[in-house]
Amino acid sequence: MDKNSVNKDSEEKDERHKIEVVDDTNPDFITADSELTQDLPDDVEVIDLVHLKIKSLEDLNLYRFKNLKQLCLRQNLIESISEVEVLPHDKIVDLDFYDNKIKHISSNVNKLTKLTSLDLSFNKIKHIKNLENLTDLENLYFVQNSISKIENLSTLKSLKNLELGGNKVHSIEPDSFEGLSNLEEIWLGKNSIPRLINLHPLKNLKILSIQSNKLKKIENLEELTNLEELYLSHNFITKIEGLEKNLKLTTLDVTSNKITSLENLNHLSNLTDIWASFNKIDQSFESLGENLSALSRLETIYLEGNPIQLENKTSYRRKLTMNLPPSLQKIDATYIRG
């Protein structure tokens, strides 16, 4: 059989087995990113393209949208954000690149000087850079990246909320928070920070979360006089101390540490919540009551998983109710019956 006969036979088989291709209305993979924005009006102010496997900003033709204020591209496959340069510098205020594959913060981000919110969480970023011109920025999110150093933030005078949980930060440097006097919330959970140091620039800080680190001591918080919520769970702290100046505290979380006694808290008259489950607290109920007697606003206490609870299971709730202030409403997530 010659070559032509083989080809003819093959063509006949192909014809007999020809399959009609039907376009998938819900494809697993978007082959043309440009189609995602082609029907949007040029004057649109908000673009939200989530979980669409977008790889390239260039193909979205973002230069068309001169009035764009918010751009959300969460859960895509974007590696480069240099194309943000084409966004309207005087209009764009909110950029969200949560859960992509970004490794570097492009210098073009620095041109978007009206930004108030920037979310780069769940990416592959190693260095904080190219943000110094974003002086209107109020919210900055870097959760779950590979950042090892808190740096290059000193010009962000408007910053109120900074999230750096789930990174590789090993220490707080002397200049880490320099210039951030308006910062109100900072989230540093799941890093490897060994000490509470160099926090003094944060005069207006209200929430400090530094859970799941390597802390052994509560210290150097005396200048954080506006602090209202302090989250220190899953560390290696052995004693409650160093809170003499933090008189506005309403919530203290020391869950899963190595604390043996609730003490040095009676001066915190605004305290409503003490979370201290899974420590080594074994003091008497009378001692506990004395140490917390002045907390007239205390509403909630968590002590489960401590010797004081494990060794007094039948009388535990009753004795706590008897010895703690009458303002108490909840013990270990269960309300006290009236």
UniProtKB/Swiss-Prot annotation:
UniProt repeat feature LRR, residue ranges: 43-64, 67-88, 91-113, 114-135, 136-157, 158-179, 182-203, 204-225, 226-247, 248-269, 270-292
Gene Ontology BP annotations: cell division; chromosome organization; chromosome segregation; maintenance of protein location in nucleus
Quaternary data: Interacts with YPI1.
Pfam families: LRR_4, LRR_9
Lineage per the UniProt record: Eukaryota, Fungi, Dikarya, Ascomycota, Saccharomycotina
UniProt-annotated location(s): Nucleus
Leader sequence residues: none
Protein name: Protein phosphatase 1 regulatory subunit SDS22
GO terms of molecular function: protein phosphatase activator activity; protein serine/threonine phosphatase inhibitor activity
Family stated for the protein in its record: Belongs to the SDS22 family.
Its job: Regulator of the mitotic function of yeast type 1 protein phosphatase.
Modified residue annotations for Phosphoserine: 56
Gene Ontology CC annotations of this record: cytoplasm; nucleus; protein phosphatase type 1 complex
Main location: nucleus
Keywords: Cell cycle, Cell division, Leucine-rich repeat, Mitosis, Nucleus, Phosphoprotein, Repeat
Domain called LRRCT: residue spans: 306-338
Top-level taxon in the UniProt lineage: Eukaryota
Further information: Present with 3870 molecules/cell in log phase SD medium.
InterPro entries, sorted: Cilia_flagella_integrity, Leu-rich_rpt, Leu-rich_rpt_4, Leu-rich_rpt_typical-subtyp, LRR_dom_sf
